[in-house]
Amino acid sequence: VEINELNRVNDHIEKLMFVQGDANKTIPKFVEENPWLLVSLLYIDFDLYEPTITVLKHLLPLVPKGGVVAFDELAKKRWEGETAAFKELLDTNKIQLKRFHFEPGISYFIMGE
């Protein structure tokens, strides 16, 4: 983090922020405390149902058109909770899931496509 912060274009704006704790508690609190927040890249790596549903409920509405939402364990039997949360909150007929040719394990979609 310290190295990444060295190349900030605007020294007064943090590029990264780590929030430690239970995601089911910290994500809703973080969103409430930061009403200005927009998310251009939402990378979901929880594997389990509860934290995935929490992040989708609270952060997905903050992803604008053109923003990217990515999952690392989508449609994997071992981590079915991530897929269950995805299917519960998102209309799979309206989302065009994509994969990287260099990393087929990551699924993503672009908001508004």
Residue positions per predicted region:
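S-adenosylmethionine/decaboxylated-SAM
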Residues: 1-113
